[in-house]
Amino acid sequence: MQTLNALYQSPPKNVKFINRKFEITAPKTLIKGGIGSGKTSLIAGFLSAFESKEFLCINLGDLRIDADEILSNLPEFLRQNPQIKILAIDDFEQRFQDKFEPVLELNLSNFIVASRFKDANLSGFSELNLDFLDYEEFIAFFSKKIDPETLFSHFLLHGRSPASAFCDAENVAVNLQTALKSSLPVTQLAVLKECAKAQAQNVSVFEIFSTLKSARKISKDRVYSALSELENMSAVSLVEKFNEPNAAKRLYFNDFAFKSALSLKKDFAKNFNNTVFCELAKFNEQIFYTKEFDFFLPKRKLAIICSPFSDADLVFLKFKKLHANLKNLGINRLQAISVANSGETSIEGIKCEVAPFSRWALGI
């Protein structure tokens, strides 16, 4: 009870908060989002509309508390403090569900639960799948007087975490490392570091296993499991090859800034591809890759190639060569995403657009 009282007396401090495209609206809300996606700040923003005596906020991942003991004592503490109308639980894991059930029987106006796991589930809760910042949200953190080229450079340097948007560029990698170390077991972190070598490329679990087994005792099954767990935590996404489900999957980070936090090796082209993927992922639609196209979204009849520095004429030449492939796939639009170039053409009803990322990301 003393620990719960200490938490109650120390509510979350006000944080610099800018409205997201997501908001808490349901009385019972389960927020699911990756490490650094802004779950905590979304909760803090919601709670800021209430007096501190009206809510209790608990981070079950806090090293200073015993989560099981906290959940066991929580129903009685809330009964003793009827002025508490809102309960916010951060860093929830499914293993806590049984001890959390008695809490849900209490008559509170709001239950807000946040988890980094996509498979988290609570009966009767509305689910809010919180993505990292997209480009439009990111630039809202900055003055409108800043030119688009500078904003795009900031985006590439800072990544998609709301916390990263506020810190100096040189501190982004260190802050992300701290967040990853505090959230991931050693094996998952080791696998994630190896994933940095496969950014925007076909990932080989065998290669990751071969590298790791020389330094630690690990099985191939454990590597598969760790990679699956990282995907479940929205740390990475694995993209299938179209019509070839057994082919190697292509790996992307859900926050492209993870690459610079995990590796000193720079590869602008691959990081640019990853940045484009992150903008597409917000649609929550099936995304594929093909031999010719970086991304293919069948539902939108859209194919995308990433050409950061190719001028429009070169892209149009490639478009002519790819026209038959586009037609066979039923694609009516090819977009070539660039750093600064632009242009447009069409052949037999299929449109080809060359667009700078900063304009494209605000228009999709």
Protein language model regions, located:
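A cross-kingdom feature that marks ATP-driven nucleic-acid transaction machinery
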Residues: 34-36, 41, 242, 249-364
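Accessory nucleic acid-recognition modules appended to NTPase machines
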Residues: 176-301
